Each structure stands twice: as C-alpha cells, then as structure tokens.
Curated annotation (Swiss-Prot):
Basic and acidic residues: compositionally biased ranges: 340-351
Subunit details: Binds DNA as homodimer. Interacts with protein E1; this interaction greatly increases E1 DNA-binding activity. Interacts with protein L1; this interaction enhances E2-dependent replication and transcription activation. Interacts with protein L2; this interaction inhibits E2 transcriptional activity but not DNA replication function E2. Interacts with protein E7; this interaction inhibits E7 oncogenic activity. Interacts with host TAF1; this interaction modulates E2-dependent transcriptional regulation. Interacts with host BRD4; this interaction mediates E2 transcriptional activation function.
Post-translational modification: Phosphorylated.
Function noted in UniProt: Plays a role in the initiation of viral DNA replication. A dimer of E2 interacts with a dimer of E1 in order to improve specificity of E1 DNA binding activity. Once the complex recognizes and binds DNA at specific sites, the E2 dimer is removed from DNA. E2 also regulates viral transcription through binding to the E2RE response element (5'-ACCNNNNNNGGT-3') present in multiple copies in the regulatory regions of the viral genome. Activates or represses transcription depending on E2RE's position with regards to proximal promoter elements including the TATA-box.
Span list, region Transactivation domain: 1-201
Keywords: Activator, DNA replication, DNA-binding, Early protein, Host nucleus, Isopeptide bond, Phosphoprotein, Repressor, Transcription, Transcription regulation, Ubl conjugation
Cross-link (Glycyl lysine isopeptide (Lys-Gly) (interchain with G-Cter in SUMO)): 417
Membrane-crossing residue ranges in chain numbering: none
Protein name: Regulatory protein E2
Gene: E2
Region (Disordered): 196-397
Entry GO CC: host cell nucleus
Species assigned in the record: Human papillomavirus 12
UniProt region (DNA-binding domain), positions on chain: 410-494
Subcellular localization: Host nucleus
Amino acid sequence: MENLSERFNVLQDQLMNIYEAAEHTLETQIAHWTLLRREAVLLYYARQKGITRLGYQPVPTLAVSEAKAKEAIGIMLQLQSLQKSEYASENWTLVDTSAETYNNVPEHHFKKGPVPVEVIYDKEPENANVYTMWKYVYYMDPEDVWHKTTSGVNQTGIYYLHGDFKHYYVLFADGARMYSKTGQWEVKVNKETVFAPVTSSTPPGSPGQRDPDATSKTPATSSDSTTRSSDKQSQQADPRRKGYGRRPSSRTRRQETQQRRSRSRYRSQSNSRSRSQSQTRALGATSVSRSSRSPSVTQIRNRRSRSQSRGRGGRGSSTDTTTKRRRSRSSSSNTRKRSQRGERGRGERGGRGKRRDRSSSTSPTPKRSRAGSRSSRQRGVSPEQVGRSLQSVSSKHRGRLGRLLEEALDPPVIICKGGANTLKCFRNRARHKYTGLFKAFSTTWSWVAGDSTERLGRPRMLISFTSTNQRKDFDETVKYPKGVETAYGNLDSL
C-alpha cells in the first residue's frame, strides 16, 4: 500500500514538471503519454488488489483504468512513429497531442490550427452551428509514410486533401437534416460569408426538407377546380372506388343494392334484346315481336335459375321459335347472374371485387407458377451457373435448401469499413491468428465520386471465402476492432 502510494506520487511529480515546463517538442509529448500509461497501469493494479484510494486520489474502476491505458498506448505508438518522420522537428504542444484533439474529426489524426466555421440554416442567425476546420492534418498512408496536408471548406462541407482527393470529415447536409426546415445553409469563416445560401441536394423525402410541391404549386383555374370537384363528388357518390374505410349504413346499402340490381337488369334486358333480335331476323317477324316484350315480363323470367331453363329445354318443342326464345332466355339469365356477381363483389369487397372483375374481363396471360420456379431452383445449380449471379440473396419465400443453392451462385465475401490503419492492423493480426478461416484479404481501398476524384466514405477492405460455412465460422470466431463495420456480400469472380 505505501509502496504504491510512493510510486503514484513520483508519477504525479513528473507530470507536474512537464506541465510547468510546457515544452513544444515531440520528445516531451512522448514522455507525457508514457507517464500517463504508467499511471493508468498502477491504478489498475491497485484496484485489482482491492485498494480504493491512494493518498487523496480515489482509484477508478478496472474498466476506466484499462481504457485509459489502451488510449495512452495507442497515442504513444503514433507519436513514436511520427518521431521518425520529417515532421518531428515541428512544434508540438500538449493540446496538439491531447486525446481530445486526436479523437476529434477527422478521427485518429494529429491536427493543428483550429479555425471555427459557422453554418447558418434557413437564413436565421439564431439557427446556427459551429464546426472546427483544422488548418493542418497529419495522416499515414498504407505504406506507413506520414504526410502533412491542409484543410478546406466549400458548400458541401469541410475536407482535407488526401493526395489529389478531398476527404470530407464534416458534411453540412447532415446538420441540415436536423436543424433546417428548408434545406438551405450559409457558410461563414471568421465571420465572413464564404458561400451564399445553398440548398441541400438530398432527396425531397428526406428529413429536414419541405415538400417542393408546396411552394411551386399555382392556383388552379376554374375549369380545373370544377373538374376536381366533380371528381371528388363522383368518388363520394360511387362507393365502389373506395377499397377501404367505413361501410355505409344499412339503409344506404339497400338503396345502392337496389340501384345496382336495376342497372344489371337493364343491361341484361338490352343484351337479351340485341341477341334475340339478331337471331330472329333470320326466322321472321314472330320472334322479333316476342323479344320486344315488356320489361316486367323479362325481369320475372330472368329470376329463374339456369337449371329451370335447362329443365324446360329438355321438353320437346315443335317450332324453332320456341327454341330460340329459350336460348335467349337462358343467355339473358346468365348475363344477369354475371353482372350481379360482379356488382355484389364490388359493393361488398370494395377494391378487391373491382380488381377481380377487371381480371375476369381481360384475356388470360400466361404466368409461371411460383411452385414451378421454386422446384426448378431446388433441383440444383449447374457448374457453369456457379458464380454468375451478382445480387445478394433474400431470405423471403425460400427455404434453407433454396437459400443455399442461391448463395452457391456467388463467391461469399465480407466487406469491412473503418480507418485505414485499423483495417491494416486487423488484416495482419487475422492472417497470423485465424489461418484457415478465410481465403484472402484485399488491400484497403475507397470509393471515388463519379464526377470528381473525391473519396467517398471510409476506407474498405474485402475478405473472401471458399464457402458460406467458412464465412460463418470466421464471423463467429473473429473479434472485429472497435469502430469497424461489416456486411455480407458476393462477387461474380475474385
């Protein structure tokens, strides 16, 4: 206990000497982080032994001490690597090498010269946000070579130059989604307007944007308003256009049913008249006179079923006129039944009945059954089809066998997104520790915009596998670094 307290006091004295000297050398900053690492390790050991206080200093939990020790080790290694570069002779302060500056955007980069950038949304000075643009940014390339670059700002955001590419670490559109109503912002640097109000290029349906039709709509003319009002009235008057909502009352439904029946009767009468007239013209004027009977008689006869008409037709008849009359009677009853079925389906089921009536009236189109396609897929995958599909497999409407056969069409991969140094360290560690759980690793790469040479998003890295089972074993075994995002995918060829 006393020995730990003495060591802790010695570390505190050495840290105070560094703070009082305030030297701007890289060697001093490395010594500072070395002392912080030793302090965190000592506090971790004290907590392990059950000690909760060293003098007047309370001992934090094991998790806090472990996190501080890892952070100190990481920054100390970066400073030691920077010491071997051409920038070791520059002035380095405690602020330049602090954990807050190192972890600020762009993350895990040493930065100097903060410049405030004010972004005003919707032309309201109260609705503003302040970002930090770093004058100089230090980064390491994939070959572990340090580079010093400058930052810039434009209407899109704040970026630093990574070679010939613009790497954005602040996008103003992200803030516009949260703070802006119109999607417009104005950029000011040192209280001077650099870019006039610009509009976000995000889709109109995204958060923080107004509907563009709301401001661009012009008053409609009288004819347009009349047409719209008539359409609304027709929609309200015809309940068949509504596929959902409340159903009308029983009295209203009875009236509508009676109207539909009268319409169907009138249509069946007209159809039967036209058919009977065309048939009886060849036979004579007798059938014409019989086909033009009063509507009441036709309605009564139309209520008879098809079986009754067939039964009547079974009896022998001596004249051709009676036979034609029975045919017209049965055809009119069939027409009435079809129309009643269609009208009843529209009234009771709304949109569904309408769609079914339309589908029954149109000519049938050949369709491939789902069961047939599924059975053909489950027969297997030919060797020449393996690796041809470029789309990821969906889990819907497929069993386990169908999903495995679909996945056999593409070589499986895992795409990792994160920092370039983090991905490289993970690749080197996995190659030695997880041999046999993967096929190959790719180098770190980035997407480039189609209309410029700017890098989009964080660096990527691909991991290929020989089968989905190998990818599953790799994903369940490997522990990915903090901040690394992963996603499954497939490629046509490797």
